[in-house]
Amino acid sequence: ALSSAASDVYKRQVFKDSILGFVAGIQLSANDMVRPGDWVTLPSGDANGIVQEITLNTVKIQNFDNTISTIPPYTLVSSPFQNWRGMTQSGGRRVMKSITLDLTTLQFCTPEMLDRYRKEIPLMADYQPEEGVVPTNSQVYRVYIERYLCSLPVVNQELDLIISQKEATMYGVPIQVYFFSRNKVWKEYERIQSDIFDHLLAMVPKFDLKVYQYSD
């Protein structure tokens, strides 16, 4: 009797899973939530890769470490997940990082400092502050970052490019750099943003600034 009862429970569960999978599959398709070839990420960490196959009961995902995750369609309908299709079809992939400056190195620029920046930094050769405004070296550095990014073919100028100073903390003053890389392929995207920030970090001393470094 126990064996029969257990068998009935198992059959009901299989039937329930099949119905849920069928309904979820219809929802995924009707709402165009996911397709084979999409890059998806689950916040749970169960999957981060390319969708290979969608069936009644499973969504098969090849992760970037070449493992395979098998996810019930119902999971994608009932739980949040990130589909990167919009990024891959758009004109760029977002880069958003910060460079944290040492607050003690921020200062108003003297005419001599501005002359030196114009002479030593080609992109700043024609820089003129607004009339009546004495800029800080941090402000001039932000102008340089924007000009530098605008000079790079790998940066999509048609999408948002924003350089902003965030609230100062005990760890310094963050300068947030926000732009879109034209190249969306993971390896090249990482190389591009690394090269850009290598350059921006190396340029910090040119503006009489220092990057904040914590020390006991």
Which role fits each region the language model picked out?
Residues 1-6, 10:
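Single conserved hydrophobic/aromatic residue that forms the stacking wall/gate
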Residues 2, 15, 193:
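Hydrophobic (often cysteine-bearing) scaffold residues that line and stabilize catalytic clefts
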Residues 14, 18-29:
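Membrane-spanning helices that line or support transport/gating and their immediate boundary helices
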Residues 22, 26, 57, 84, ...:
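Conserved, well-folded catalytic cores of nucleic-acid-processing
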Residues 27-142:
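Soluble accessory domains appended to multi-pass membrane transport proteins
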Residues 119-216:
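Long, non-transmembrane cytosolic or organellar matrix-exposed soluble domains/tails
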